[in-house]
């Protein structure tokens, strides 16, 4: 059944992900006061501690402080700074609830990493600046060629299933979401964040740290499907990306080149397929 939840191990109601503020609001030409829940946005500094004892700043991300462990792992993987979970020896500055309450996380890496910090993008708002070409992506991860297929009715049920699990959005109205579904439409995880790319990195980190399969999975996102969303999905091995909103031209180009089925405008009992439609069963 589409939207059946099988293992929601991810807790989006973590303390610190929202704050309450007294606001004034307009009703009937007059102002009233009420409490409003606000999504938290705070910086997270990510450092890498290599085997030589040298610490390098990998980035500073503006994020909602929940599931930082997944965010850090997904970010480092998407950036090509780790090749898999085996590269990570441990986390410092991340508490048992998976959150860095000091807004500073250090990842112990068991291999030497060489990269130019100044040439890397440290802002989660853009993906292509100084980054990958299609050829570079295909070097890191071969073209997706799975024979995975999914029923149209299952695709249509994904937004509702994701929306019901978006606890932080329902509370604040101020965050994006990314979700991991299998091709039977069963929901495995929903990750929310003030940044839509962060939400995807959290899903990617979840699959890495929890050992979840992506070969027969769908990445569902609540916002538009831009280049970086498709790039992250490809590097994580997702054959299908689904969005309730529009794709960008570059996202379509990347999806077509790397073998991803890109399905957008999934709403009101309809959707558009922009690349590799052979995976969708009418």
UniProtKB/Swiss-Prot annotation:
It comes from the Archaea. Keywords: Cytoplasm, Molybdenum cofactor biosynthesis. One of its GO terms (molecular function) is sulfur carrier activity. One of its GO terms (cellular component) is cytoplasm. The active site is at 126 (cysteine persulfide intermediate). One of its GO terms (biological process) is Mo-molybdopterin cofactor biosynthetic process. It is found in: Cytoplasm. Gene3D superfamilies: 3.10.20.10, Cytidine Deaminase, domain 2 (3.40.140.10). Mo-bis(molybdopterin guanine dinucleotide) binds at residues 265-270. Required for formate dehydrogenase (FDH) activity. Acts as a sulfur carrier protein that transfers sulfur from IscS to the molybdenum cofactor prior to its insertion into FDH. Belongs to the FdhD family. This is Sulfur carrier protein FdhD. It comes from Thermoplasma acidophilum (strain ATCC 25905 / DSM 1728 / JCM 9062 / NBRC 15155 / AMRC-C165). The gene is fdhD.
């Amino acid at each position: 059944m589409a939207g059946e939840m099988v293992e929601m191990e991810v807790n989006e109601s973590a303390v610190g992900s929202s704050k309450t503020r007294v606001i004034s609001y307009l009703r009937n030409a007059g102002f009233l006061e009420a409490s409003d829940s606000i999504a938290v946005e705070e910086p997270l500094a990510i450092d890498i501690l290599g085997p030589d004892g040298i610490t390098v700043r990998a980035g500073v991300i503006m994020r909602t402080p929940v599931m930082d462990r997944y965010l850090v792992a997904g970010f480092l993987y998407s950036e090509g700074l780790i090749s898999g979970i085996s590269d990570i020896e441990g986390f410092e500055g991340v508490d048992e609830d998976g959150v860095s309450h000091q807004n500073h996380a250090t990842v112990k890496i068991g291999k030497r990493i060489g990269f130019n910090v100044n040439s890397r993008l440290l802002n989660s708002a853009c993906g292509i600046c100084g980054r990958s070409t299609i050829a570079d992506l295909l070097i890191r991860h071969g073209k997706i060629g799975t024979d995975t297929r999914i029923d149209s009715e299952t695709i249509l049920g994904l937004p509702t299933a994701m929306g019901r699990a978006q606890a932080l959005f329902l509370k604040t109205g101020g965050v994006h979401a990314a979700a991991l579904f299998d091709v039977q439409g069963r929901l495995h995880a929903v990750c929310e964040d003030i940044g839509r790319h962060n939400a995807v990195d959290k899903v990617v980190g979840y699959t890495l740290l929890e050992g979840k399969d992506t070969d027969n999975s769908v990445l569902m996102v609540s916002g538009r499907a831009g280049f970086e969303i498709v790039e992250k999905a490809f590097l994580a091995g997702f054959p299908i990306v689904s969005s309730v909103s529009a794709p960008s031209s570059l996202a379509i180009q990347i999806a077509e080149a790397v073998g991803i089925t890109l399905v957008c405008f999934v709403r009101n009992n309809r959707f558009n397929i922009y690349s590799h439609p052979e995976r969708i069963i009418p």
